[in-house]
């Protein structure tokens, strides 16, 4: 299957993505939006994630004659020259860039519209983009929070008993950021999450309410959620579907956050799969997407 690196103009330099083409030029096009932090277009991260879910997904879609473009966010990886300081990026900037990709792809190819597939935090970006883009076929929300990200972050921190000594400080920081206030003093263990340089971005994304955004989406929506996701839960999928009753909801058993099948309830095996690039995507992931994109 053919792969091609694409570039479009960014604010200061190019934004970059990878096109994987199906056989038919007029086949549907899916734009894959990465999740939080330093997640690249393959779905990998220097923080230990090597499962490559986006690359595997692109290959599986192409095998079913669906084109895809998976992108690097501005300031990171192939899009690092798009902005001098990636810490100055706000959530709305990512949505603007996705809108620019949609316009480029819709003008470039034979598709009248583009599907957005957002994974995790990328689902929030997809929802934000859908508020203003008029050239979307629909949304595919994969492991997407159904509540503001501050609530998700609280739950993630509280679920790990090792974090208990840090929780008073962490909860105070989250509350301040929710109110639009920065926090100058952050203890060393919490620096990776809350260092002052990223607080502006966190303030911007904590203001995003996915339930309110999805209510404004007129086109088709697929909500795809695994039961063994350690970061986003089936309750999030239910919250999104309640706000968008005509959405298609697929809950996949034993599927985790990086879209791999894992033994039910086995946290260690679940976490190990994050580094297993040769582990295929879980059965049902691609099938659910194809059923919506190519009904």
What are these language model-derived features?
Residues 104-159:
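Primarily recognizes the serine-hydrolase "nucleophile elbow" in alpha/beta-hydrolase
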Residues 217, 223-225:
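Short beta-strand/loop motif that positions the catalytic acidic residue
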Residues 255-259, 263-295:
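Catalytic active-site module of serine/aspartate enzymes centered on a nucleophile-bearing elbow/loop
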Residues 52-80:
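Conserved alpha/beta-hydrolase
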């Amino acid at each position: 299957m053919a792969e091609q690196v694409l570039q479009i103009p960014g604010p200061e330099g190019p934004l970059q993505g990878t096109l994987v083409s199906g056989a038919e030029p007029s086949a549907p096009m899916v734009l894959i939006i990465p999740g939080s932090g330093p997640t690249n277009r393959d779905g990998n991260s220097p923080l230990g994630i090597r499962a490559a879910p986006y690359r595997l997904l692109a290959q599986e879609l192409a095998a079913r004659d669906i084109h895809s473009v998976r992108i690097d966010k501005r300031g990171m990886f192939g899009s690092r020259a798009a902005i001098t300081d990636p810490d100055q990026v706000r959530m709305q900037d990512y949505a603007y860039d996705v809108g620019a990709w949609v316009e480029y792809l819709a003008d470039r190819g034979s598709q009248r519209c583009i599907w957005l597939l957002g994974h995790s935090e990328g689902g929030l970006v997809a929802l934000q983009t859908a508020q203003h883009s008029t050239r979307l076929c629909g949304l595919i929300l994969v492991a997407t929070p159904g509540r503001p990200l501050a609530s998700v972050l609280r739950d993630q921190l509280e679920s790990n008993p090792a974090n208990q000594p840090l929780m008073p400080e962490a909860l105070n920081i989250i509350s301040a950021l929710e109110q639009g206030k920065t926090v100058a003093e952050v203890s060393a263990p919490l620096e990776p999450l809350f260092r002052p340089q990223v607080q502006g971005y966190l303030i911007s994304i904590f203001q995003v309410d996915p339930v309110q955004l999805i209510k404004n989406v007129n086109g088709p929506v697929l909500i795809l959620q695994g039961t063994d996701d350690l970061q986003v839960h089936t309750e999030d999928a239910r919250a999104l579907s309640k706000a968008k009753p005509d959405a298609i909801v697929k809950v996949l058993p034993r599927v985790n956050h990086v879209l791999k099948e894992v033994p039910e309830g086995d946290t260690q095996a679940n976490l190990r799969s994050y580094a297993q690039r040769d582990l295929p995507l879980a059965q049902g992931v691609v099938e659910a997407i194809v059923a919506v994109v190519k009904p």
